[in-house]
Amino acid sequence: MQRSNVLVIGNSGVGKSTLINAVLGEERALTGYGTKGTTDKLESYESDSLPFRIIDTIGFEPTFLKEMSAINAVKKWSKECAKEGKEDNQINVIWFCVDGTSRKLFPKAIESLCKATAMWKTVPVIVVITKSYSVPERKENIEMVQNAFASQKKYAKNVKKILPVVAATYELNETAFAAPEGITELIDATNELMPEGLKAGVLDLANFKLNRKRQLAHGIVGYEPVLYLNIAP
């Protein structure tokens, strides 16, 4: 049975790997602390308890070269899907992870998301607000995400859900902890969107192949007259 695919994407240090481990129910993805990411290539994770595969990505970094490296890694994975026999790698749902403690979502992060997933123009997106330790701030963070995407109307239509999540127990102080929360809701939301995502993945992949054929055809047509002119007496 073909598994669907969920792409997990976002800035370095937002907690993508911790989120993946929480969804899998075991420590599989390498985790770290601070703003430096721990994933240096795309990794695929499966579990018998999940109907979908999870694709972890390289986090977006502030520097241009590292940012482009992360974007190009996703684009390369996506283009591999167009090869014969690789269609089961198509992306069906995207989890865009945002740090709930930062209180900001910069347009650049959304732009990086758009560039990296440009091939998947109609695939549904769930914005996952990680590290949502403060319950009172969750509503503010949801509004923050809504406002940030409002300025990116072309991509905003793909955002289907915004979910605050606590992926691992977090110590607030000596006597208080933030318990894991929102993981079941995230899995349920993903499963609900998957029928739409499966159709979107097939459509986007077909459109990519069609556009590539057109580009190749234009390239050949454009080349022949030049070749003819060069060899004509």
Name these PLM-found stretches:
Residues E196-N211:
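Short, flexible loop/turn segments with low-complexity composition
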Residues M1-F64:
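Conserved G1/Walker A P-loop phosphate-binding module
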Residues E27, P62-T63, S102-L105, P136-E137, ...:
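Conserved protein kinase catalytic core
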Residues V123, Y133-K199:
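Canonical P-loop GTPase G-domain recognition
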Residues R212-L216:
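Regulatory, non-catalytic segments
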Residues A217-P233:
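Membrane-inserting effector segments that mediate pore formation, membrane fusion
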Residues S49, N72-N158:
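Conserved C-terminal guanine-recognition region of P-loop GTPase G domains, centered on the G4
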Residues G34-T35, E67-V74:
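Short glycine-rich substrate-engagement loop in P-loop NTPases that contacts/grips substrate
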